[in-house]
Amino acid sequence: MTASNDDMLRYQRQMAFGEIGLAGQRAIQGASALIVGVGGLGSWVAELLARSGVGRLIIADDDKVDLTNIHRQGLYDQADAAESRPKVLAAAGRLAEINSAVIVEARQLRADAGNIASLAEGTDLIVDGTDNFHTRFIINDYSVKYSLPWIFAGVVAAEAQLMPVIPRRTACLRCIFDAPPPVCTDPTCREAGVLGPAVATIAAMQTAEALKILAGRSDAISPFLTKINFWTNQIQRLASAVSPDCPCCQGGHFDYLDA
């Protein structure tokens, strides 16, 4: 992809960062990413990737904008909530205003084992904007089976987690978590609440990892499970070694795709 004069100006400061440069920017503009869920995490990631010039974004979510979303979710406003606009349609409209050169494909549906392949087809990366571990395990199985990188993240209350997964190189989600936690023990934002800045900050970190991969610099990712408490400012970086007993990346069992 050649850089136009407008591109040279729009992305000038990003290209001036030597780790990206012109070659990295061209790679970013030629890349595609699937964002599964455009709520708290996904809305911010979508905006940041669009501003960074990612060529094509597929956004998938079946939810509508609610007033309780506004304190932590980017792209949406009170008018969207009043009209109960589908998130993907509201998001697509805002993203077009931010960067009309980015192709945005809005899919008003919930990602599952039956549609993840069609959603991810032709993409270079999956970004986790979901709110449940079952969907994350589906994404993980697809990622490992088809060697497609993805970035796990989640926030509840003030506690956030982040881990990039590059098949054949890093641990996968099932190396770390044997199974999705039971629904009764997995608190949600509805039950435990959520700190808005925690969501925006971990989404920015997710986006930075995504840009490393899309710019051809996956060597620079942070190969850890990072945990941050945004209320106490405690940060943990936990080694995320490949588990020799992992049924997914080591055993080749993709149970959550087959379910």
Task: Name each model feature, range by range.
Residues M1-A259:
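Adenine nucleotide-associated cytosolic modules
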